[in-house]
């Protein structure tokens, strides 16, 4: 067999991914494809990360039996990462939940009782009583929901409607708060609109790739295979990788940079200074399309107001800024000299200069990629703003092959959490609850009384934990997320609230996760192709899939759960009289009738489905629920830069990148000839801002919330590994992936281990000011920390590393810093 170069690169990428999991390529094929006769195939996006790879799902006799890369999918072109090849097995773990479970004692609910099987009606009976009691006694602020960037688009939309319009509570937030909130605020501050302006097609046209806190080789391996192909096929292409420790992406790096935690802010300002000092500003672009502003500083760390760091902050939580001149900006970044930067970061001068030269060279098309290294950062918004500065100074933006690109970690952190607006402060299409005009638009479209949606921002993820602990949030429903394992400071700020007898906790999940086992009621959930769905990936690509099998037992989709539960409430039970008086025709109606079974949503008949097409929710209700919800939601974005295509178009396509105008998707936003919202002669227009100009921010270095000292003498950073996704609730139930990486380890520099009389394979106690875990010493693995730093993945439920993490957040985005806290080690 003769392989083309492209085929050779793909084959090597598959082999590398398979080898990482201890499998041969034929072994992968045999494990997931099996016998293809009589298998029915249909398309779907992958269930895992935000890359949005397309897969072909094979079903047989009511089960998913096979999965392969979709050769027609433009994202991955037929290639899967190792997790993608094992997608069928995530659905059939031996401990899959199939019926609701309630803590009971002597036949009744008891907070200290044992989990006991009950019916869905019984589950909703208990939930109804708890919700109504909380609403009556303490009001809408006493209930809350924690959702997910893994929700389908219509699940997130239905949840947001139920809480913000139905229950009149903005206490709904997604787990994307922990991963993408800093990116969102960064986009909004700089451009006035969320999400990247570029797309994956940039990869094949770029001259340089700079990774800021992104281990794409393991976390976005399919995109990394495309970057690898570009780098190895073109000797003039350069790859720079910046991180606080060495990882697999360094294997391709021409310039691999290890910097002191938090000092990425220094490097970013140094590069801006270098660009100015070397007259590398694109003056035409800069003068026409950019404003300069100086941001507020000393903004705190998002901790409780009583924390000493918050008391000491001069401008806690401030996102204020003021205009500044170019001369003032030039003077501001001039402080970040090469010498000072090298001293503060620990990076050799020659490496810093090489990096800066990539951005300054007018002939180099540069893509900046980042993920959690930037976002999970107490100055994550600033880091996002500062990397935009580099592209705005040089004009390397919104054109093929160059631009800043924020990568996402979840399959629909963009499509659901961000675009739908399931954050505590957001509404669809970049609208926000604090804006009266935005609330009015939603209330009119939803045909609910004016004033229904609260103007006050609800509780964000970390604030929800604190409110539960303080007894202020009393009924809490989490869906499609495992926050007891994934969130910070488990011992001090999360577990106390979940187990507080004042509070009732509901967890909807397919498996008995750490979160489920800490709850009071567990609802069994349909997953992936057991329901019809839609995700939006990192490049603004919206992708649909059909329901292909039915969920086991009594498991139901999150959408079904939300819609059916809404039947339990009448408007008089959730809205005050002054609202009902504005729309008396809504009296006596259930929230189901007001929010979901409306003429707008229910107008698409179930007959639009093919006779043999599964769709459990729509067939039960008698109308095409998913289509109705999507078309209502899509209305919000059409006409002002967030345009989604008609519903039916997505079932025909392998995804479309918004804005989709006149049937054509958009690859590059904000530039003439690429974006339908930029008129001829405008060149560039950042139309999220009233004047069409993007903002360069002057923002300084500020230290981390916690750093090593004499007692807690090591930095701890947390993250993921190739074989497991997030908390491992799916991937650890795949035998092959579990065997490949069965338990978490503590990656440590050999000299740090030796100084503590530790050897590879030893058990070690990792201790912070908040908790401790026992792990296993690893001095040779794929991750190579420098002296003074240790790294630990968070997929292992037996090693809850987030017991150790401080619940410090970026004060602007409220996103947790999972990359930096101080620990000490004790030999076990």
Swiss-Prot record:
Keyword set, alphabetical order: 4Fe-4S, Electron transport, Iron, Iron-sulfur, Metal-binding, Molybdenum, Nitrate assimilation, Oxidoreductase, Periplasm, Signal, Transport
Classification via Pfam families: Molybdop_Fe4S4 (PF04879), Molybdopterin (PF00384), Molydop_binding (PF01568)
Gene3D superfamilies in UniProt: 2.40.40.20, 3.30.200.210, 3.40.50.740, Dimethylsulfoxide Reductase, domain 2
Processing and modification events after translation: Predicted to be exported by the Tat system. The position of the signal peptide cleavage has not been experimentally proven.
Regions annotated as coiled coil: none
Chain positions recorded as [4Fe-4S] cluster binding sites: 46, 49, 53, 81
Signal peptide as annotated in the record: 1-31
Location within or outside the cell: Periplasm
Catalysis performed (reactions): 2 Fe(II)-[cytochrome] + nitrate + 2 H(+) = 2 Fe(III)-[cytochrome] + nitrite + H2O
Binding-site list for substrate: 794
Matching InterPro entries: Asp_de-COase-like_dom_sf, CT_Nitrate-R-NapA-like, MoPterin_dinucl-bd_dom, Mopterin_OxRdtase, Mopterin_OxRdtase_4Fe-4S_dom, MopterinOxRdtase_cofactor_BS, Periplasm_NO3_reductase_lsu, Prok_molybdopt-oxidoreductase
CDD domains (UniProt xref): MopB_CT_Nitrate-R-NapA-like, MopB_Nitrate-R-NapA-like
SUPFAM superfamilies for this protein: ADC-like, Formate dehydrogenase/DMSO reductase, domains 1-3
Record-level GO cellular component terms: membrane; nitrate reductase complex; periplasmic space
Domain 4Fe-4S Mo/W bis-MGD-type: 39-95
The record's free-text note on cofactor binding: Binds 1 [4Fe-4S] cluster.
Required co-factors: [4Fe-4S] cluster; Mo-bis(molybdopterin guanine dinucleotide)
SMART domains (alphabetical): Molybdop_Fe4S4
One GO-annotated biological process of the protein: nitrate assimilation
Function: Catalytic subunit of the periplasmic nitrate reductase complex NapAB. Receives electrons from NapB and catalyzes the reduction of nitrate to nitrite.
Record family assignment: Belongs to the prokaryotic molybdopterin-containing oxidoreductase family. NasA/NapA/NarB subfamily.
NCBIfam families: NAPA, PRK13532.1, TAT_signal_seq
Subunit relationships: Component of the periplasmic nitrate reductase NapAB complex composed of NapA and NapB.
Protein name, per record: Periplasmic nitrate reductase
Lineage: Bacteria, Pseudomonadati, Pseudomonadota, Gammaproteobacteria, Enterobacterales
Gene (UniProt): napA
């Amino acid at each position: 067999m003769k392989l083309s170069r492209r085929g050779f690169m793909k084959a090597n990428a598959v082999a590398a991914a398979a080898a990482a999991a201890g499998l041969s390529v034929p072994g992968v094929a045999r494990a997931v494809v099996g016998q293809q006769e009589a298998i029915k195939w249909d398309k779907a996006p992958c269930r895992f990360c935000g890359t949005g790879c397309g897969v072909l799902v094979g079903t047989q006799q009511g089960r998913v039996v096979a999965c392969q890369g979709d050769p027609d999918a433009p994202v991955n072109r037929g290639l899967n990462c190792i997790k993608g090849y094992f997608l069928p097995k995530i659905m059939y773990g031996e401990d899959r939940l199939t019926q609701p479970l309630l803590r009971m004692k002597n036949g009744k609910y008891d907070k200290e009782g044992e989990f006991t099987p009950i019916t869905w009606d019984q589950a909703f009976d208990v939930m109804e009583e708890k919700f109504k009691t909380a609403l009556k006694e303490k009001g809408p602020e006493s209930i809350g929901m924690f959702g997910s960037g893994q929700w389908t688009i219509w699940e997130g939309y239905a949840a947001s409607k139920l809480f913000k319009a139905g229950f009149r509570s903005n206490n709904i937030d997604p787990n994307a708060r922990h991963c993408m909130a800093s990116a969102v605020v960064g986009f909004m501050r700089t451009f006035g609109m969320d999400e990247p302006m570029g797309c994956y097609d940039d990869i094949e046209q770029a001259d340089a790739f700079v990774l800021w806190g992104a281990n794409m080789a393991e976390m976005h391996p399919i995109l990394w295979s495309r970057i690898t192909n570009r780098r190895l096929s073109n000797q003039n292409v350069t790859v720079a990788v910046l991180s606080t420790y060495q990882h697999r992406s360094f294997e391709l790096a021409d310039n691999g940079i290890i910097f002191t935690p938090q000092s990425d802010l220094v490097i970013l300002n140094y590069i801006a200074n270098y660009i100015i000092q070397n007259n590398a500003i694109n003056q035409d672009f800069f003068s026409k399309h950019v404003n300069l502003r100086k941001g507020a500083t000393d903004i705190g760390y998002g901790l409780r107001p009583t924390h000493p760091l918050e008391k000491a902050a001069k401008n806690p939580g401030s996102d204020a800024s003021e205009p500044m001149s170019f001369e003032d900006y030039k003077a501001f970044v001039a402080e970040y000299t090469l010498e000072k930067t090298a001293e503060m970061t620990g990076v050799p001068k020659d490496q810093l200069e090489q990096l800066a030269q990539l951005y300054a060279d007018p002939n180099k098309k540069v893509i900046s990629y980042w993920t959690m290294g930037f976002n999970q950062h107490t100055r994550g918004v600033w880091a996002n703003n500062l990397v935009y500065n580099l592209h705005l100074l040089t004009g390397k933006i919104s054109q093929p092959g160059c631009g800043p690109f924020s990568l996402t970690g979840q399959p629909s952190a963009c499509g659901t959490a961000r675009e739908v607006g399931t954050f505590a402060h957001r509404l669809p299409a970049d609208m926000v609850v604090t804006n009266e005009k935005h609330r009015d638009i939603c209330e009119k479209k939803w045909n609910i009384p004016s004033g229904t949606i609260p103007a006050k921002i609800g509780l964000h993820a970390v604030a929800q934990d604190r409110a539960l602990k303080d007894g202020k949030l009393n009924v809490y429903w989490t869906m499609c997320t495992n926050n007891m394992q994934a969130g910070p400071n488990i011992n001090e700020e999360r577990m106390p609230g979940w187990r507080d007898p004042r509070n009732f906790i509901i967890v909807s999940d397919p498996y008995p996760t750490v979160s489920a086992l800490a709850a009071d009621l567990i609802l069994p959930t349909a997953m992936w192709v057991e329901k019809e769905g839609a995700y939006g990936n990192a490049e603004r690509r919206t992708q649909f899939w059909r329901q292909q099998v039915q969920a086991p037992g009594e498991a139901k989709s999150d959408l079904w759960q939300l819609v059916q539960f809404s039947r339990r409430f009448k408007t008089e039970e959730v809205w005050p009289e002054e609202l009902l008086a504005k729309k008396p025709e809504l009296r006596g109606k259930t929230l189901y009738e007001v929010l979901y079974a409306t003429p707008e949503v229910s107008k698409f008949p179930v007959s639009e489905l093919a006779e043999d097409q599964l769709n459990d929710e729509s067939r039960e209700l008698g109308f095409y629920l998913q289509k109705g919800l999507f078309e209502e939601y899509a209305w919000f974005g059409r006409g002002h830069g967030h345009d989604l295509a008609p519903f039916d178009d997505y079932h025909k396509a392998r995804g479309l990148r918004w804005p989709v105008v006149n049937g054509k998707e958009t690859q590059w936003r904000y530039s003439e000839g690429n974006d339908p919202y930029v008129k001829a002669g405008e060149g560039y227009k950042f139309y999220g801002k009233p004047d069409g100009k993007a903002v360069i921010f002057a923002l300084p270095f500020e230290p981390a919330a916690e750093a090593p000292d004499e007692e807690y003498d090591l930095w701890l950073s947390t993250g993921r590994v190739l074989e497991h996704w997030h908390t491992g609730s799916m991937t650890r139930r795949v035998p092959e992936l579990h065997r490949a990486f069965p338990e978490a380890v503590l990656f440590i520099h050999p000299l740090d281990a030796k100084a503590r009389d530790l050897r590879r394979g030893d058990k070690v106690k990792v201790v912070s000011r908040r908790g401790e875990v026992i792990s296993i010493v690893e001095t040779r693995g794929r991750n190579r920390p420098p002296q003074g730093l240790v790294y630990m993945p968070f997929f292992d439920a037996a090693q809850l590393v987030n017991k150790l993490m401080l619940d410090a957040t970026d004060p602007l985005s409220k996103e947790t810093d999972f990359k930096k806290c101080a620990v000490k080690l004790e030999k076990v």
